[in-house]
Regions:
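Active-site neighborhoods and metal-handling regions in enzymes and metal-associated proteins
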Residues: 1-611
Length: 611
């Protein structure tokens, strides 16, 4: 199993740990301390030894930050985690904050005590975030204090060691472009802009540029590493050699100089001396890294990670690999959904369902000689009220049976060498209510509107986001998460800069893979989400039209529960899409499924709906 269902944190230690942290404030010369859910690489997924927020508070979500003051402690989360936060932390110690509308810097400017001294670990905060904090503190006469050591690390006596996951080569057959070509492209751009070098601080960008993958963090196959690429084409990769076997080390030796991570500071300082201009991404690179450049009299040039957009715009090899991975994943999903349909309500638990799905993926991967490398995130397997927790993680404590008359939501994904998948299906268990069916159909309408959208060049994610919500808005409902996130190519299941959300201003470009996942959640009762992955491509021309259009191609093929759809709520075009999607799903997956009973189930699950 690639996931555990054990309880990984508990709220019971929060009070003592916060008290111990506060006890050190005077000696550190601070009045408050920020604890982000981050490591020094500022990635979404972090190794166990960097789960400081969970250790301190009990909150295990993938996004959040705690502000610990002398008499107050606030954990800021986004809409996905409001319910989870309330369940995981001690409410007598911590209050909840709004990470989107009133993040720590906004809260401090409005509520911080005059002259407040805020301590941070400069390795855990990007440069852009530090600027926001400094500006907020200046409004209250406060000071940002950069601490030489993280005070939590001295309190966390059994903190796990740094990971040493093995590095593998991502061959050009999967990557589509040679690493030396990617390095040369970056170097040429640096030279054109009169820059000495760029610091690649995002491990996913390092993995993409050098065509390598790693195993340092759960479910995201990148190595925790940084790189410096010089304008003259030289590349230095700061990667522990204990992670590279003979073949990867020999491969890397042909395209770069591999150095230990401890050499980064000296090499970054060396390229910065005498006014060397070094490009860093202020939204990714730790503030401490920028300070190394400044201390060496170099010039920090802020700009986007040069790999971020090219990594998001998949080449044909990556798109084709993703399509193949999704067919394989769809076959595993069908095997799982068939099994679930045969089980009596009340006899299958949330954990057993997650285990069976992972086993199906492993079995199909073995039969197709494309093994399951990992899951792409911990499976969200939630029944009834648990489905209303957007990022619910079932544990041995919360596990329960999936009962008749309720909705079961399973959001899962896989890592294959040729692609990353992410799919959500909501299933009715036995006879469900008309309210369940109504909201399911409204969510489906939004998903279809995104799937069929046509839009001109220059369209941004925020321009399309309302399409997924209009049907819900008309019913006086909404959902508190984005409609879609970018997805990597055997990399992170959450990839930027592409998104479909209210705040996404990134132009959608051909080759970008995104999720399409509207939902509806009623706390304490039920939750609904339907998710396919899609990619941007050119749309067919319309006779008489004079503007080139883009659209989406669907990558995910898996039946959507017909029993939950009220056909009369769909337009003719929406019903046509639904039936055509099921026809294509049947045609795509039937050749991959050999069990007679599973084939019969797929046939029935994809029959057309009628008014």
């Amino acid at each position: 199993m690639f996931q555990s269902f054990e309880v990984t944190s508990t709220p019971q230690f929060g009070r003592d740990r916060v008290s111990a942290l506060r006890a050190g404030f005077d000696s550190l010369g601070i009045d408050a301390f920020l604890v982000p859910r981050a490591d020094e690489f500022n990635g979404e997924y972090v190794p166990a030894g960097s789960e400081r927020l969970a250790w301190l508070t009990g909150f295990t979500g993938s996004a959040g930050i705690a502000l610990i003051l002398r008499t107050q402690a606030i954990v800021f989360v986004d809409g996905r985690y409001v319910t989870q936060l309330a369940e995981q932390v001690d409410g007598s110690v911590f209050s909840g904050g709004d990470l989107v509308n009133e993040p720590p810097h906004v809260w401090l400017a409005a509520n911080g005590a005059k002259g407040l001294r805020l301590g941070i670990d400069p390795w855990l905060h990007a440069g852009a975030e530090v600027r926001r904090l400094e500006k907020a503190l200046s409004q209250i006469g406060g000071t940002l204090v950069f601490l030489p050591h993280n005070p939590l690390d001295r309190l966390w006596s059994d903190r796990p060691a740094e990971p040493l996951g093995a590095v593998s080569i991502q061959n050009v057959a999967q990557a589509g472009v040679l690493a030396r070509e990617k390095i040369a492209t970056v170097a040429a751009d640096l030279s054109k802009k009169n820059l000495a070098a760029v610091l690649i601080a995002d491990p996913s960008s390092v993995a993409w540029i050098f065509n390598i993958r790693g195993a340092d963090v759960p479910h995201t196959p990148h190595p925790l590493a940084r790189a410096i690429i010089h304008a003259d084409g030289r590349a230095e990769l700061f990667l522990d050699k204990r992670k590279t076997g003979i073949e990867p080390e020999a491969y890397l030796g042909q395209i770069c100089t591999q150095l230990p991570p401890s050499a980064l500071e000296e090499r970054l300082a060396a390229v910065s001396r005498n006014g060397g201009r070094v490009l860093i991404d202020p939204d990714i690179a730790s503030y401490a890294l920028a300070e190394i450049i400044r201390r060496a009299s170099g010039e920090v040039v802020e700009g986007a990670d040069p790999a971020k957009l090219p990594r998001a715009v998949k080449n044909d090899v990556e798109i084709n690999g993703s399509a193949a991975a999704h067919l394989q994943d769809g076959a595993a999903m069908v095997e799982f959904l068939y099994w679930l349909s045969q089980e009596k309500p009340g006899t299958v638990s949330e954990i057993v369902a997650a285990e069976r799905l992972e086993a199906a993926r492993a079995r199909v991967g073995q039969s197709m000689q494309n093994p399951l490398k990992d899951i792409s995130f911990d499976t969200i397997s939630g029944a009834g009220e648990h489905a209303a927790i957007m990022h619910y993680r079932v544990t041995t404590e919360t596990n329960r049976m999936i009962e008749a008359g309720e909705l079961f939501l399973i959001d899962s994904g896989a890592q294959y060498i040729n692609g990353t998948t992410d799919i959500t299906r909501t299933v009715g268990i036995g006879r469900v209510t008309e309210e369940h069916r109504r909201f399911f159909t409204l969510v489906l309408k939004g998903m279809i509107e995104i799937s069929t959208a046509r839009f001109p060049k220059g369209t941004r994610g925020c321009d399309l986001d309302p399409l997924a919500r209009i049907a819900l808005w008309r019913a006086g409902a909404d959902f508190a998460h984005g409609t879609g996130h970018g997805v990597g190519s055997y990399l992170s299941v959450h990839e930027g800069p592409q998104r479909i959300s209210r705040l996404s201003t990134q132009e959608l470009l051909p080759g970008m893979i995104l999720s399409n996942e509207p939902g509806y959640y009623r706390p304490g009762s039920f939750g609904i989400r339907i998710e396919n992955l899609i990619y941007v491509r050119g749309a067919e021309e319309i006779e008489g039209g004079d503007t080139a259009m883009l659209g989406f191609e669907t990558l995910t093929f898996c039946p959507i529960d017909r029993s939950l759809v009220i056909p009369e709520l769909l337009t003719h075009d929406q019903l046509h899409w639904f039936n055509d999607y099921h026809r294509r799903t049947r045609e795509a997956l039937m050749p991959l499924i050999h069990d007679h009973d599973v084939r019969a189930w797929l046939e029935n699950a994809t029959l057309p709906l009628e008014y």
